[in-house]
Structure formats: C-alpha cells, structure tokens
Amino acid sequence: VSSSELPGALYIETTNLCNARCVFCYYPKVHGTMPVKYMNMDLFKSVIEDYVQMGGKEISLTPTIADPLVDKLIHERLEYIDSSPIKKLRFYSNFISFRPKIREAFQNMSNTKFDIGISMTGFNKEMYHKLMGVDQYDKVMNNLRELSKIVQSNSNVSAHLVLRKYKGDEGETDRMAKFCRDHGFKSHFEEVYDTWGGLMEEDIKNNEYLKGRIRKRLPRTKPCEVTYRKPLITVDGDYKVCECRDVFGELIIGNVKDTPFSEMWVGPELEALRQRFYNEDTLPEICKKCEMYVPK
C-alpha cells in the first residue's frame, strides 16, 4: 500500500471502560451494560506488526467511547510502541488516571513521538463535577502538573488540551487556558458539541450548559472522509470503519483474527460500505445524523 493510500493513523481500542460520566458523551448510557474488556497483548502486537508491514507509522489509542489510561495494560502498550518502528503515537484522555506505572512509561518514551490530547470541560470543582459527571477536578489538575514536568524534560512527549466551552462560564475557561500556557501545554477551545449520530440529540439540546452549541450537519453527498482516515480495531479485534461515533458497531466489516487489517483496508467490504453513502436508503443508520460527517 503506498503511503498516500494509508489511513492517517490506525486507531486501536485497548479497553471499553471509562472513568468519567460526561454529559456530552454516550458512554454513561452504556456503562454497566457490557462486560469490561482489555485487548489481549498478543492481539495488540499483531495488529501493530501488520500495520507496520503496510508501511504504517502512526498509531492512535483513542477509542469510540472509553479512556485509554483506564486500560490496565496501558504502560506495557506504551513501552511496546516505543520499542516498535511506529514513529508517532497519539490519543485523547480525560487524564483522571495517571498511575505511577503510566507516569513512568510517559517519562521513558525515547523513540516514538507521543502527543497526548486531554479533553475536558468544567474548569472549577463544581462545574467539572456537573459536566464530567465525576468529582475528579483536583486530581486532574494535580496530574496535569505532573505531566508538565515530563513534557518539559522529555522532548518526545507533548500535550494539548481541548477546552470545551459551556454556558455560565465566569472566566474560569480563560484561566484554564493560562494554566496550559504556564505549564507548557498547547490548548484550543471547542465551542460546539455533536449529538453522537442523533443518539444524544435531546440530551444536548436540553442541557442548560450545552444547549445551542450543536455542531452543524453537512448534507451526505459522498463517502465520509473518516472511512479513509480513522479505521479502528476494537478491543475484540473487529475492524470498525469509523472511530468517531459508531457506538454499537454498525460499521464493523470484519475481524483481524480472521483477516488481517492490511487485507481488509484494500478489500471489497470497505469499498461497499463507502458506496452506501451515495444513496439515502442505504446510508448506515448511525451516519444519517452524524455531525462528524465530512464528504471525502
């Protein structure tokens, strides 16, 4: 596969567990309804080896709904990636979990360039609890101070924060942006929320802090560009064509235990799924209202 035909990164879901209950995320609705899983380490390695053979150089551990740092094997995975030919690693986390073993793995990154994105909202104790659904504001702020030391001492590790705006802000978001600057983190504001393909439409519209902040939907004219850019291998080894919002696996076209990702990426199933975007009747259900959709 030529480098121009490779996805921007291969996404790997190493766990399906999250430790926050964000009001703008679908995770709280499914928490407790499915068994907690962690990707088997041999499967994880085989997925990366296959991707490297294709010429792949970038991995993301951002799942659809979960937090990579809750994965009990995350430190081992970071060590493995750092020892592999993978050049770049990135993923998003709420950064509630920053256990000593994870901290050590961050400190020891010496080969792979690693950029962690931290997604959060509610920039004081009270608003954080209301919007992130857990009382972990102080813990996250302390974890960020620890991360700052690593970012400033290890040039392979960088961090950026996505600061999600909300109604009722009394200046705390700007103070958080200053905190980022002072601690060596990049940051940007996110003004809008999406509805998880319509699954969260009522929740977002009716939330006093988020209402009126829904991302615009684009008309479906061509295959979604995400199908070219963000393939996800789930904790069970399923190849899900979209990393973004496919909570229930409607866009799964195979499993890497049966067929390697390298074959599925150039196979007929992927092309057939993309073709479904040309007709409203065949458009996957989850894609019909998705605000993450961008035509390729």
Model-derived features: positions:
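Conserved alpha-helical substructure of the radical SAM core
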Residues: 1-115, 126, 130, 134, ...
